[in-house]
Amino acid sequence: MERMALYLVAALLIGFPGSSHGALYTLITPAVLRTDTEEQILVEAHGDSTPKQLDIFVHDFPRKQKTLFQTRVDMNPAGGMLVTPTIEIPAKEVSTDSRQNQYVVVQVTGPQVRLEKVVLLSYQSSFLFIQTDKGIYTPGSPVLYRVFSMDHNTSKMNKTVIVEFQTPEGILVSSNSVDLNFFWPYNLPDLVSLGTWRIVAKYEHSPENYTAYFDVRKYVLPSFEVRLQPSEKFFYIDGNENFHVSITARYLYGEEVEGVAFVLFGVKIDDAKKSIPDSLTRIPIIDGDGKATLKRDTFRSRFPNLNELVGHTLYASVTVMTESGSDMVVTEQSGIHIVASPYQIHFTKTPKYFKPGMPYELTVYVTNPDGSPAAHVPVVSEAFHSMGTTLSDGTAKLILNIPLNAQSLPITVRTNHGDLPRERQATKSMTAIAYQTQGGSGNYLHVAITSTEIKPGDNLPVNFNVKGNANSLKQIKYFTYLILNKGKIFKVGRQPRRDGQNLVTMNLHITPDLIPSFRFVAYYQVGNNEIVADSVWVDVKDTCMGTLVVKGDNLIQMPGAAMKIKLEGDPGARVGLVAVDKAVYVLNDKYKISQAKIWDTIEKSDFGCTAGSGQNNLGVFEDAGLALTTSTNLNTKQRSAAKCPQPANRRRRSSVLLLDSNASKAAEFQDQDLRKCCEDVMHENPMGYTCEKRAKYIQEGDACKAAFLECCRYIKGVRDENQRESELFLARDDNEDGFIADSDIISRSDFPKSWLWLTKDLTEEPNSQGISSKTMSFYLRDSITTWVVLAVSFTPTKGICVAEPYEIRVMKVFFIDLQMPYSVVKNEQVEIRAILHNYVNEDIYVRVELLYNPAFCSASTKGQRYRQQFPIKALSSRAVPFVIVPLEQGLHDVEIKASVQEALWSDGVRKKLKVVPEGVQKSIVTIVKLDPRAKGVGGTQLEVIKARKLDDRVPDTEIETKIIIQGDPVAQIIENSIDGSKLNHLIITPSGCGEQNMIRMAAPVIATYYLDTTEQWETLGINRRTEAVNQIVTGYAQQMVYKKADHSYAAFTNRASSSWLTAYVVKVFAMAAKMVAGISHEIICGGVRWLILNRQQPDGAFKENAPVLSGTMQGGIQGAEEEVYLTAFILVALLESKTICNDYVNSLDSSIKKATNYLLKKYEKLQRPYTTALTAYALAAADQLNDDRVLMAASTGRDHWEEYNAHTHNIEGTSYALLALLKMKKFDQTGPIVRWLTDQNFYGETYGQTQATVMAFQALAEYEIQMPTHKDLNLDITIELPDREVPIRYRINYENALLARTVETKLNQDITVTASGDGKATMTILTFYNAQLQEKANVCNKFHLNVSVENIHLNAMGAKGALMLKICTRYLGEVDSTMTIIDISMLTGFLPDAEDLTRLSKGVDRYISRYEVDNNMAQKVAVIIYLNKVSHSEDECLHFKILKHFEVGFIQPGSVKVYSYYNLDEKCTKFYHPDKGTGLLNKICIGNVCRCAGETCSSLNHQERIDVPLQIEKACETNVDYVYKTKLLRIEEQDGNDIYVMDVLEVIKQGTDENPRAKTHQYISQRKCQEALNLKVNDDYLIWGSRSDLLPTKDKISYIITKNTWIERWPHEDECQEEEFQKLCDDFAQFSYTLTEFGCPT
């Protein structure tokens, strides 16, 4: 019997890879093969000169059931017995949905040749690069983009590309296939998530993707840029020199900025910034340049122990203001490392292995602390007497002579900088390991490339050095070499060697294809067994593979002028252009496309992981990114990841603080501490505290208090304050002499942030150098800036080329820079500034005018222009402020014109100002889960989203509701919950009797089945599968010993045949047949036939005549319902073998039907959960069960099937239940069950747990198969919106589930949503509206708080005004509060005075513990003040200045909140606001509807009477809307205006108001016009007004009294009897009668 088993094993193993004798056959492939990519492989025969045909196959792994590629090649002596066939693996033939790594089997067969290698698969078949027109956008703007697609040969790819847009929250909002020749822009919505967005591009049906980023912010472009250049890239703690930062400020049109910079240094420790307050300095910016200095003494005074800062970073925060104070740019230089040694040494470019007795090239990479290359730094390895100096890329090569017998080599390298002491030099050590020769042969190969800067066009010398015994060297006839580039085998060649040559040199021509780097791998063979190899990594200078240049005239251009640029590039190239305002790059230049970024991305496709060489011959191939196998069983390790572990990133070559002090007084104190107590007095106390009260805060002792009081009283007697005020004289002048007429000035109005988004093809005939050129003509836009023209070309054969940016400088000698905020609030007064620049070398006199726009209230009116005239000095600028109040929501023009007297210089600018509603934007979020199967009625779910109740909405503002629907794909639960690496114990060699052998065979069968299905072989080892298959083959052959002639089985052949064991053999063999070739269908189907003919009863049940000896192998059969169990178990075996035996067993279908009918009768009466689960699986597998109610009723907690004290049986039974539900497609029930199974951490045993082991892993494998393929998501959703006649319909399926669908409506009405179908989705309803600001009065608990502000005079550089903010608080408890926070929200346009806050936190009489300023430019500034305590007995007061940096009127209040750090419920909030009565434009508002009120008041018409015809003529002018006789009922006051409430007594001329007599009317006038009007209560008046003075609101019309309003007192009836009024009354009567009866004359 044993001989028969051995024979069968040998027969089955035929066809598995075997060794050939007499020659060495080699197969080399890339270690990672890419789909849809032509890959070159190498097959070589050494020691064989017989021509032969080789078949090359690529199969799927692990089962090799599918041939993915095949070809045939001829190997012959003429070709050196070396062939390099090209293979290509179609992506559509392999799984792209798997979460696990995918592998393929590369197989070479031929006469005497059989080679096979499992190789990792990658889906990165090509590259996608995304270019956007800019890196930052505002809400509502379009995102323009291009996608460039190329393969690894840099050739154009024409595959379908999908482009997706994702919000900062990761929500997919757009997904479309794109035409690579034309791209539609993506339009950002107005209501959009701010932050960093992603554009993801990927090929259709490919998991690989490429991402580009852009920011969405509310921003305005700066007018100048600031660049900072530190004197060193590090701060050396032991140095003696101060640290300097050079500041360069340039306007974006190229001219230098004159102004001032405020510089503050600090240290960033982890994520916390700790400033150095004493470093705050004011630096003049002269001719655009300035220099800030951090003195070491200042640094040490803040951080006495600099050693504690090593490893942290220094930063410099710089704020630059222009001379006029009109503009400000804030920037920061960070990442300046604080170091004990200024350099770092890396060995990332150094091979870790050496060859004893041969030179070792040690490449040292030296960087600055920020990671940038450190050039010109001497380095030395003293032990080897080798030294060198780094090149510009930071590298230096040291040649080390290695002893002959060295096995390891400790190497220490240090910098040798002359200015550093030895202990501060950078030092780095490594240990290199000797290359291990194969079998200790002592044969070596050393490949040396000594050139440093390598570029295309060079001829590179490559040296092959050999060392070994004489006999071996005689056998070397040639070297085989491979050149790898971008992860592919680029070239294969041979270099001959003559006898006696220890050094062979070849020249390698460097072509552009080898950019950005390549690997040179070489090897030779010794005999027919040994391979000796070496490799080296070579960097190539980054350039375009082709050519692209943008040329222009390099002249300064005028805005709007015509100009030309010339494109020069490769013939046939397609060039994409864009011109970007340089100001955009000041805000964000992170995402700009560049050639370096392209090469950095491409270089990541190099699958090599070291700088060259290797631990041994196999290590050389592995580290270079190659897979090798030979006929002598030399095999590289299995690669399990496409990417290498990443070492250190390779850097491609790529308020003024003014301190008043009285030094003489302080000098009286010799003691340094007491002197400081005196000096701290000199700082003015913002609170105005007396000297005695200030002394209470001193904690340094009585001596300090005494010194403080003495100095304080002295200073109080001598201090004086000088205040100066500066005014800007603005005049109105109607003099036109010498100025260009405004109508002749054409305003500039086109100010895009980017433009020239064009694509041009270079189709022109090339010149003698092979360069094609194209000249483009265009008109510049109106911006005065520098346009950066970016050009990116794509050539089918030379890939992508990014040209050097070409800059177009645009300016005028005299121009306006109109600076406006991103948006302003309706009815909120704001100042805009026009900066007039004079670049003429002489003084000029200028007139500037703000043009009238009815959408604004301003000094310019319809009838009177607002002009100012003033001089501007030569080569200087002047800021002119204009105050406006926007009255209407939307985009409105602001236009300024200016001209120079007696000159032809003029300019005009018209820009759009965005006006947003009042209030604060709020959102209400509602989330609805759509699950029609669970929540619907009759399969349809109906949801009605009720209209919102928005009681706090600002009247007449829009409501916007967004409905976002996103599918919920069914999640995979199992993932890697079952760790495949823990199945090692199941791969065993079967042995023993017929039962024991099957127990042991089932283990590798189920392990292989599970690991195949879940693709987890790499966790156990790819090579272990061959071992497992061999064990299965062994078990199969062993079981044949126990097979009887009738195909039944028993533990021994002399025992009676077992029904259960025979069914078990059928089941396990049927499963094994899926994984192992050679398992005969006769063997499987013979067992099926025996079971049907010999063991099935007439009623369909199966019986057992000979129970197995090993009862535990049967699992849960023990107990009641054994006949049902056996029938169900055998039925499962029949069903699982049906695909094999259906054509060979005629009675199989009828047998299955009989067994099924038997089980159906028993199923609902079963008592045991175990039997119920097994029977349910058998019936479901036979397609006879689709109702899960009985099955689920037998469960415990609906997630497992439990019987008392039977854990492994419970696992087995639960596994049957899971299989049953999967067969019934009840996928929604499976999740909890899978979780229960995986939570058991059950990895099985071979004895006592056989069935539980087999069934658990079979069920989990089936779940892995079923869940990704069923993709049970097919939802139809209908949305009925109030403003749409046609409902909106969406269909959500598995492929588009993650795409967020958004629909919007502006009507606040009910929305109806219906969903039907299968699956789930999430519906998010977002309602946005503007809510009225509400001050919650007296929001106080445990704190008293009083806040006030007062105007102060201050002459601060850059500040437009100042307020003193006074905060007084007291704790209302019985004792003082402990740590307390004061959170201050600043007024819009104001910043805190840093000097005041510093004084409050410093000095011996410090009032606050510390403070923080949150200066987020997109929001209001916040100041956080920390107090150690707040008194419960007296007020604690803080006074500090807040400085106005830009004008905002009608601003919203600021707030002050005080609260306990330890009890957030103890808090108090108060609001503060500057005086509203000063400097505000006149406007009249009813609710939120406002009108601009003119400067001139109307007055009561009574001085001179006009005759009736003239009066009728005036009343009938076209602009007059109404004529009434009214009675004044009362006078009210509102918001600083007078409200005259009148009753209409008579309608003389009908106006807009259809029924004016129905109710009283409000006539509104400015308070200042009260005296001029002099209206009296109960008097009657004739009144008319123009249509433009009506103020309609939702339910009424109010009337504004302006200079256009006619008001005349109408005498009472008794007064008309008097002679004085008779004529007037007659005229009024005639006037009224004429208009009433006859109307206005036509």
Swiss-Prot record:
Residues 736-747 are annotated as: Factor B binding site. Residues 1497-1640 form the NTR domain. Residues 654-732 are annotated as: C3a-like domain. One of its GO terms (cellular component) is extracellular space. Keywords: Cleavage on pair of basic residues, Complement system impairing toxin, Disulfide bond, Glycoprotein, Inflammatory response, Magnesium, Metal-binding, Secreted, Signal, Thioester bond, Toxin. Residues 650-732, 985-1263 form a propeptide. Glycans are attached at N153, N158, N209, N1346. First processed by the removal of 4 Arg residues by furin-type protease, forming two chains, alpha and gamma/beta precursor, linked by a disulfide bond. Probably, the cobrin cleaves the C3a-like domain and then the C3d-like domain, generating the mature cobra venom factor (CVF). This mature CVF is composed of three chains: alpha, gamma and beta. Contains 3 N-linked oligosaccharide chains, two in the alpha-chain and one in the beta-chain. Glycosylation is not required for the biological activity. However, it contributes to the immunogenicity of CVF. The carbohydrate content is 7.4. The major oligosaccharide is a symmetric fucosylated biantennary complex-type chain with an unusual alpha-galactosylated Le(x) structure at its non-reducing end. Residues 1-22 form the signal peptide. CDD domains: ANATO, complement_C3_C4_C5, NTR_complement_C3. SMART domains: A2M, A2M_N_2, A2M_recep, ANATO, C345C, Thiol-ester_cl. Residues 1190-1253 are annotated as: Factor H binding site. GO terms for molecular function: endopeptidase inhibitor activity; metal ion binding; toxin activity. Disulfide bonds join C544-C801, C609-C644, C677-C704, C678-C711, C691-C712, C857-C1492, C1340-C1468, C1368-C1437, C1485-C1490, C1497-C1569, C1516-C1640, C1616-C1625. Mg(2+) binds at P516, D539, V540, D542. Residues 677-712 form the Anaphylatoxin-like domain. Residues 985-1263 are annotated as: C3d-like domain. There is a cross-link at C993-Q996 (Isoglutamyl cysteine thioester (Cys-Gln)). It is found in: Secreted. InterPro entries: A-macroglobulin_rcpt-bd, A-macroglobulin_rcpt-bd_sf, A2M/Complement_sys, A2M_N_BRD, Alpha-macroglob_thiol-ester_cl, Alpha-macroglobulin_TED, Anaphylatoxin/fibulin, Anaphylatoxin_comp_syst. Expressed by the venom gland. Belongs to the venom complement C3 homolog family. Complement-activating protein in cobra venom. It is a structural and functional analog of complement component C3b, the activated form of C3. It binds factor B (CFB), which is subsequently cleaved by factor D (CFD) to form the bimolecular complex CVF/Bb. CVF/Bb is a C3/C5 convertase that cleaves both complement components C3 and C5. Structurally, it resembles the C3b degradation product C3c, which is not able to form a C3/C5 convertase. Unlike C3b/Bb, CVF/Bb is a stable complex and completely resistant to the actions of complement regulatory factors H (CFH) and I (CFI). CVF has been used to study the complement pathways and to investigate the role of complement in disease pathophysiology. It has also been used to consume complement to prevent the hyperactive rejection of organs in xenotransplantation and for targeted complement-mediated cell killing. CVF can be safely administered to laboratory animals for temporary depletion of complement activity. Interestingly, it is able to deplete complement in serum from all vertebrates tested, except cobras. Heterotrimer of alpha, beta and gamma chains; disulfide-linked. Is active with factor B in the presence of factor D. This is Cobra venom factor. It comes from Naja kaouthia (Monocled cobra).
